[in-house]
Amino acid sequence: MQTLAELQERRAYECRLTPGRALETLNEAERFLCDRGLLTRTTDSALPSLFEACHEEPYAPESPGFGQWPATKFPWFGKLGARGHHILAVHRGKNMLVTDAVATLLDPICRAEIERMERTDPDWARLLRHLARAGPSELEDLQTELGLKAKELKKLRAPLERCGAIVPRSIVYEQPHRHTSELARWDQVHSGRADADGGDAETDLHHSLGDLLVAAVRAAVVAPERELKRWFSWQWYWDDLLVDELVHDGRLERVDDHVTVAE
């Protein structure tokens, strides 16, 4: 087993935490995403960050928020999404890029969230069922068809996006120039996999979250164990024994209050 210092050194290399490993091109950024499996936009945890790997001066050094984004490479996050990689808000409401392989791990959870949210709230159910009938729809069309104001639709869609039930896609029109988004249900943007054969649904989702956590720890190389519970939105699927189970099953290893993927 590697020491924590050795793992952190490997993390610095694989997650491009040093200026000598800075991303130089969009193609290089896409290879970085495919290697890691998932990327956050900005640094907020041990999960690898696209903008951190750019090592570029901020757009507006004196300004918080967007001003701290890389001066010229900030569009790369959206451009990678335009190349077919999913951008999801399942990092507790923050956007995350994921590859198809990680999307497959997310699939049973996101499909379960569609069903749960349809049962939980009639307004959520109305939007989800409308998208099921109409297909992926632009915001303006949804406002008209559902009789909603822009702020009402924004408030309605936010929790659905946070849980992975719906997925937005940015659209830019040139003539006349305008920006909008298209909303789709998760099951309209990812083909999914065969259903489990008769297993207990709650147990299956517990295992799915475990699979996702292993992939996320692999992306990070090594991470403080206390962080893992805060990485994804679905606290209701979390069990405090989950990490113990993954260690017992030989999928994760503990190293000085951190975890890494077992060798």
Where do the PLM segments sit?
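Long, low-complexity intrinsically disordered regions
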Residues: 1-263
